[in-house]
Amino acid sequence: MKVLTDLQKRIFAIVKKENGKPIPPGIVVRMMENQAGFPGKQQVYRAIDDLLEWHIFRKSGGATNQLLINYELADPVLDQKFQGILNLGNKNTGFVRPLDDDKTVYYIHFSNLAGALDGDLVEFCPLDKPQVGDKFDAAVLKIVKRSRVLYAGNFLIEYSDFGQEFRIVADNPRFYLTPIVNKASVPAELESNTKVAFQIDEYDPANNLCKVSIQQILGNNDEPLINLKAIMLDHSIVFEDNDVVEQQAAKLQFDEKEQSKPYRKDLTELAFVTIDPATSKDLDDAIYVKRTDKGFVLYVAIADVAYYVQRNSELDIEARHKTSSIYLPGYYVVPMLPERLSNELCSLNPNEKRYVVVCELNFDHEARLNFSEVYPATIVSQRRFAYSEVNDWLEDSDALKDESATVLESLKAGFTLSELIAEQRKKKGTIDLSHSETEVVVDQNYYPIEIRFLTHGKAETMIENLMVVANEAVAWTLTNHKVHLPYRVHPRPSKKKLQMLLENIVELKITQPNFVLDTVTSTQIAAWLKENKDNPSYDIFVILLLRTLGKAFYIVNPLIHFSIGSHHYTHFTSPIRRYADLTVHRLLWMNLFTPERFTDTEREQLNAELEQICETINDTEIKINGCERTANDYLTTLYLSKQVGQTFHGFISAITSFGIFMRMDENNFDGLIKITSIPEDFFVFEKDRMVLRGKRTNKVFRIGDRLTAKLTEIDTVQKRAILTLV
């Protein structure tokens, strides 16, 4: 419990007299000016800031950010019980939406969490209090289901006058409970500063305590690889070694008899090549392009994973559980399939026969699609290219002077076709959201040694364009055969989100759009981006637009993929690393290629499972994306820890009530400038304009503003770089 100063008690008394009504901070200051012993505006604002930091006050959330007492005793409305997933913020106050009503938001103060943690399924009820803004106050009644069984933390041994004590510091900053370690669960050989996985045995919500037992020893807390594994565990990505799956994969062989089957075409004479990152080992796709009198023929050959991974086998069950391969920074990969498949039998390695599913597309001279077909085939990849090799060749034709003429002609035709496809897709409304990206380079022990800006060359663009048209063609093929499938969709952004975007870019001098928010099309968004291509704030504009557009996901209904400008889109081209693609391949086999080999019951069973498959993939994708972001933040801050004291340049990428995020030019990472560290004034967050404004000087910080700041601290708990203005 915080002990309030006399000044803070006086401020608290003023707010309390409002009986739950919001009061602006400026009015509090004005009322105190009439009291004896007024310490000055700056001191009052600093005291208010402390009360907000301690959760004693909260802001109303409206445009004026008025003050409310954060937690008051109120009766629970027990005849209105709901269930929902709890989302905790950095200050461990929560928000929850009922499972059957995602529009109503309930605010749960730290005191009303009842021991629930971020991601838990909880039962909650509203409190008998007035609604504030667009949120209701609520309290957790019970934890229905924990979001995970295991949590990661650093095990410490400490010594005091009372002897040896065990302590665990949880990795997740939102794990607010204090762990009390069950000594019986501590192995005798366990050393201090060891990363462990622990489970909650009991919890005491009144005192924010929990009794825990150690379940796994992960390794030395200072080793990056151990921390990457702990990050996966903390995002509920826990995959045990499965001997049955590995044994099943080890028995699989390339069967020469399969290539003579009547349903499988022999394309081994065509000059297929693969083009991938230099470090890739799982080569899903190969291409061959030829020019004809009528235009172009594109062959997109994709690894025939469904041939090897039979439905409901141990391999399939494990892949469905994982839903995709995981690629963490530093090339740490957790494959969806055993390496026997992902890197060998299914991977389209050069000079080896491989079974594939081919999408053959015939275009006219302007890359308008005339027709397409999908079928099983056998190919031999003639060359394994890295993107960098092909990009070098585009700059210098002698770079591949020893390659066969057939391969080079295919590459030339592929680039021409890709550029024409890009023009056609612009007409359909494909949105170019490319912006600067980085990767963390690590040494053999996963210690970060460099932050490198990624180059996106013409080779990468070509493969993207060719894969997109193949994905779309397969979606249309299955749809035309009345086969249900997992569509990849990206809904149109809501009017509310677009309105927020327009408010956020007011200060960026971005050209205002001339479209109607309710009916905006991707073509209009693409044109808006093009209009502002030369704006100095273009990069931050793209970042804000990405946040507005939201996330793509899988669903059985054919909704629009807004950013691609497609009404029927799926994922077909990466079955080695995505279960959605493997499912699409399986649907092709069961309904188009060899329907006679499957029963109607099998088709009906898979059809009935599609919705659950999509839901599982969507949920896991969120976890994996969060895991990848956390891993990147960890390695980046570990790298920056050696640069404390150095000066960086950048622009404001986000503004919050607690500070400014500056994206550093040198590494593309967002560092935090705390609002309390900004000198010369007390700054207030104006949410309606997304600016910080000084109360005395009226100085304003806006998104997109250029700044210079010094790196003063690395917050290893939040995985943040802390900056101060210079």
Swiss-Prot record:
Keyword RNA-binding part of the UniProt annotation: yes
Location of the protein in the cell: Cytoplasm
GO biological process, one term: mRNA catabolic process
Annotated signal sequence range: none
EC class (word): hydrolase
A GO cellular component annotation in the UniProt record: cytosol
Ranges for domain S1 motif: 645-726
Reactions catalysed according to its record: Exonucleolytic cleavage in the 3'- to 5'-direction to yield nucleoside 5'-phosphates
Keyword set, alphabetical order: Cytoplasm, Exonuclease, Hydrolase, Nuclease, RNA-binding
Domain RNB intervals: 264-592
Domain of life of the source: Bacteria
EC number: 3.1.13.1
SUPFAM superfamilies: Nucleic acid-binding proteins
GO molecular function, one term: exoribonuclease II activity
SMART domains: CSP, RNB, S1
HAMAP family named in the record: RNase_R
PANTHER family found in the cross-reference section: DIS3-LIKE EXONUCLEASE 2, RIBONUCLEASE
Functional summary from the UniProt entry: 3'-5' exoribonuclease that releases 5'-nucleoside monophosphates and is involved in maturation of structured RNAs.
Family from the record: Belongs to the RNR ribonuclease family. RNase R subfamily.
Protein name: Ribonuclease R
Originating organism: Mycoplasma pneumoniae (strain ATCC 29342 / M129 / Subtype 1)
Lineage: Bacteria, Bacillati, Mycoplasmatota, Mycoplasmoidales, Mycoplasmoidaceae
